[in-house]
């Protein structure tokens, strides 16, 4: 199965519309072909993933248990920190940017 990361949110005034864009995209992806990895970027620029990201009713304050994740340059793997150590979360095969505005659709 292909791991598909969908990035949404962001550090700008279009943060909320980007969440809607990301969730709309996710709702149309064939889950039999792709393992969807939602990656939410909060207004501080921190990245998170977790199942609670798939429900719009959880935004912005009810995101439950999320993993704070990040990428390493020239690597297609999301990592998280546990007990002060970097741990592998998942390899990303394809990434889709559903970001709007500065630090998003500007590249």
What residues fall within each predicted segment?
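ATP-binding N-terminal substructure of ATP-dependent carboxylate-amine bond-forming enzymes
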Residues: 1-107
């Amino acid at each position: 199965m292909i791991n598909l990361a969908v990035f949404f949110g962001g550090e700008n005034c279009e943060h909320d519309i980007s969440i809607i864009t990301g969730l709309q995209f996710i709702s149309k992806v064939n889950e039999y072909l792709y393992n969807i990895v939602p990656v939410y970027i909060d207004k501080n620029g921190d990245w998170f993933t977790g199942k609670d990201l798939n429900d719009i009713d959880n935004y912005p304050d009810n995101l439950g248990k999320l993993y704070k994740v990040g990428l390493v340059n020239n690597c297609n793997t999301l990592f998280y920190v546990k007990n002060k150590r970097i741990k592998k979360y998942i390899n990303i095969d394809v990434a889709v940017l559903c970001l709007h505005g500065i630090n998003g659709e500007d590249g």
